[in-house]
């Protein structure tokens, strides 16, 4: 059994300005996406130039932040938004939804693709492998914040979160970091190393993330004000993830059939 380390969520205090670890994790994710994007842009099959990657990351970052924050409140905490609309601006408090961020990024990529006249699926295939490092960093931020804790567990690496009592729990944030961040990055980077049918990389991202997320939900506590939706185990995260898996598999099948046609 492990004890959760009491980590100060503020990484650096500069007078009245507090720099939070959670915010720094987003910076790490965006910088990683920018660096990897610049590297991928040197490939002969890249739909964007290295200079265009700068704008792509800016559009993507804007879509992630706006979509993730709005998505959290719309999917998980609509009453909280009505009671405190300014909570939308307090990014350091967490409360970011992946599914909302995905919608925001999709909209941002759509605008970018229209602006530069790039087929949307070519652009999303380029961008998908840039995302997992940011996802993993975000889950590390959740761990530092002491949020999104796991269900009670008796495994040797179970962790006690003092604010929740003495009951050991799964460190589900670290599970998500390992699967949605590290494993997904390795999978997508390997898969996209060779030219693939248009839409295949995007489809793999959607399907693989969906499977990883649905799996980890079995070890993660649902939001207290929502609870389980059915069967004593089904969570809202799993419900929102199912369309991703179906869309991802469908997109891969479509891409390969189109390639072989």
Curated annotation (Swiss-Prot):
Function: Catalyzes the transfer of the diacylglyceryl group from phosphatidylglycerol to the sulfhydryl group of the N-terminal cysteine of a prolipoprotein, the first step in the formation of mature lipoproteins.
HAMAP family: Lgt (MF_01147)
Main location group: membrane
PROSITE patterns: LGT
Gene (name only): lgt
Record-level GO cellular component terms: plasma membrane
Protein location: Cell inner membrane
Family stated for the protein in its record: Belongs to the Lgt family.
EC number: 2.5.1.145
Annotated source species: Halorhodospira halophila (strain DSM 244 / SL1)
Entry binding sites for a 1,2-diacyl-sn-glycero-3-phospho-(1'-sn-glycerol): 139
Protein name: Phosphatidylglycerol--prolipoprotein diacylglyceryl transferase
InterPro entries from the UniProt entry: Lgt (IPR001640)
Entries under Pfam families matching the protein: LGT
MF-aspect GO terms: phosphatidylglycerol-prolipoprotein diacylglyceryl transferase activity
Annotated metabolic or biological route of this protein: Protein modification; lipoprotein biosynthesis (diacylglyceryl transfer)
Bilayer topology: Multi-pass membrane protein
Superkingdom of origin organism: Bacteria
Transmembrane segments: 17-37, 56-76, 94-114, 118-138, 173-193, 199-219, 236-256
Lineage, broadest ranks: Bacteria, Pseudomonadati, Pseudomonadota, Gammaproteobacteria, Chromatiales
